[in-house]
Amino acid sequence: MIEIKKAKPTSPGRRHVVSVKNTELHTGKPFKGLVEVKKSKAGRNNTGRITVRHQGGGHKQHYRVVDFKRNKDDITAKVERIEYDPNRSANIALVLYADGERRYIVAPKGLKKDMSVISGEKVDVAVGNCMPLRNIPLGTVIHNIEMKPKKGAQMIRSAGTFAQLVGKDNAYAIIRLRSGEMRRVLLDCRAVIGVVSNSEHNLKSLGKAGAKRWRGIRPTVRGVAMNPVDHPHGGGEGRTSGGRHPVTPWGIPTKGYKTRRNKRSNKLIVQKRK
């Protein structure tokens, strides 16, 4: 059961807090055999330089090893529990296969404890089941989609997201993403049936800056508030407008200026996002 709670304004930090509570989530510790140490990088690379700004601090986390390949074919797995995962917006499910192996998978919406899932070439079209796009009926809602066969799911993994299979053309399937983009994917790539869980994730409101800090996100300082040595907009006597068109700390135009290179997979886009 999902509960959306708005905190009472007992303090400025509680006034705007909106929390989403799922009473069906496991409250204990994660399964020890599928947990790895996650070292805090604080936005630094291997030479110690900051390569991603505004990262650092936050609560210590452990990484849950999630199975995105779903390559254990034709063996039924029973859902033992649904868990919270601090590393992603979706919930995860701990499943126990008939041969005794346990794995974490991204939990789809509607998957509950004691339900069964299975993956394979020809399995039932049911929530949580994984199969090649070749064998999925048109119009089916899917998630956790591979971009290359046997590489593991790379698309549609965030909370509440889904795509729809709208066509099949020679060796390719055509899927429609939430953004309106139409994309071709090889028919041999696998996908999972259903919508990703925790669709209420976007209703959360952290309420205060400290909640961002708990998540390892540091403040974003405006360029005009800095000194000239730190930013092209810095300096000046009193408040200034920056004196030029908006740029990044490295002098590259921002606010609409395109810097992204085309990906090789862009050639598979049939229709651009709206």
From Swiss-Prot:
Listed SMART domains: Ribosomal_L2 (SM01383), Ribosomal_L2_C (SM01382)
Transmembrane segments: none
SUPFAM superfamilies noted in UniProt: Nucleic acid-binding proteins, Translation proteins SH3-like domain
Family annotation (InterPro entries): NA-bd_OB-fold (IPR012340), Rib_uL2_dom2 (IPR014722), Ribosomal_uL2 (IPR002171), Ribosomal_uL2_bac/org-type (IPR005880), Ribosomal_uL2_C (IPR022669), Ribosomal_uL2_CS (IPR022671), Ribosomal_uL2_dom3 (IPR014726), Ribosomal_uL2_RNA-bd_dom (IPR022666)
GO BP: cytoplasmic translation
The keyword Nucleotide-binding is assigned to this record: no
Secretion signal, residue range per the UniProt entry: none
Pfam families: Ribosomal_L2 (PF00181), Ribosomal_L2_C (PF03947)
Region (Disordered): 224-274
Alphabetical UniProt keywords: Ribonucleoprotein, Ribosomal protein, RNA-binding, rRNA-binding
GO CC terms of this entry: large ribosomal subunit
Amino acid composition bias (Basic residues), ranges on this chain: 257-274
Gene Ontology MF term list: rRNA binding; structural constituent of ribosome; transferase activity
Family listed: Belongs to the universal ribosomal protein uL2 family.
HAMAP family, per the entry: Ribosomal_uL2_B
Subunit and partners: Part of the 50S ribosomal subunit. Forms a bridge to the 30S subunit in the 70S ribosome.
Function text: One of the primary rRNA binding proteins. Required for association of the 30S and 50S subunits to form the 70S ribosome, for tRNA binding and peptide bond formation. It has been suggested to have peptidyltransferase activity; this is somewhat controversial. Makes several contacts with the 16S rRNA in the 70S ribosome.
Name of the protein in question: Large ribosomal subunit protein uL2
Organism: Francisella tularensis subsp. mediasiatica (strain FSC147)
